[in-house]
Regions:
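Beta-propeller and closely related beta-sheet repeat lectin domains
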Residues: 70-73, 152-155
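Beta-rich carbohydrate-recognition and catalytic domains
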Residues: 1-66, 75-147, 160-168, 172-203
Length: 203
């Protein structure tokens, strides 16, 4: 199971502060992977019961420097398990729509989306990770709403029904007010220059 333990101080309604260092620590909001034996499902169906926990990824790139978290369910591709996850940074903004957008002090959290590919056999190993976001708030519907400057990936659909197994439709929240859909095409080879937290994750 992929999940993110929730730590105080980084909810959208709270003030954002950039971390003082790039040290990897438990307090950073990161993506974790947890396991449990399949044999447990017969008598304990709750996914809250896990026995093996590993930190999969922490914030690395500028667009995700405050925190990262899961997004779409993992979907199997030719390269491994693909997930579209969200990352959060802080941007300077002006309140362009008084009365419509929540008031700000000139700083705003910005939610963008990136791609991560995990090994098919060993999903705790990151094979590829976006150096830049694949989706970032640019449309008016993404920049203005209940929570401004948010794209939040949630659903994903492989279009086998159209005979296009390498086409993925990603459904995402737009400023917490609307639902959008974006197209993602799986390439023949993974792009170079992926980033990871550790040498082991680059395998």
């Amino acid at each position: 199971m992929l999940h993110r333990p929730l730590f105080p101080g980084t909810r959208p309604e709270e003030t954002a502060h950039a971390p003082a260092s790039r040290d990897l620590d438990i307090g950073r909001e990161s993506i974790w992977i947890s396991y449990r034996p399949i044999s447990m499902e017969a008598f304990q169906p709750s996914l809250r019961i896990q026995f093996s926990h590993h930190r999969l990824a922490t914030p690395v790139s500028p667009w995700e420097r405050l925190k990262i978290g899961c997004g779409t369910p993992p979907i199997l591709t030719r390269h491994g398990w693909l997930i579209v996850y969200h990352g959060v940074s802080e941007i300077e903004t002006l309140n362009e729509n008084p009365g419509k957008d929540p008031p700000t002090d000139g700083h705003q959290l910005c939610y963008s989306a990136g791609v991560m590919v995990l090994s098919k056999e060993h999903p705790q190993v990151i094979r590829y990770r976006s150096t830049k976001p694949v989706l970032t708030p640019t449309l008016p519907e993404e920049c203005h709403g209940t929570v401004a400057h948010v794209v939040f990936p949630t659903g994903i659909d492989r279009r086998d029904d159209l005979g296009l197994p390498n086409r993925l439709d990603v459904y995402y929240g737009m400023a917490d007010s609307r639902i959008g859909v974006a197209r993602l095409d799986v390439p023949d080879t993974l792009p170079p220059g992926s980033v990871a937290d550790s040498p082991e994750a680059k395998a």
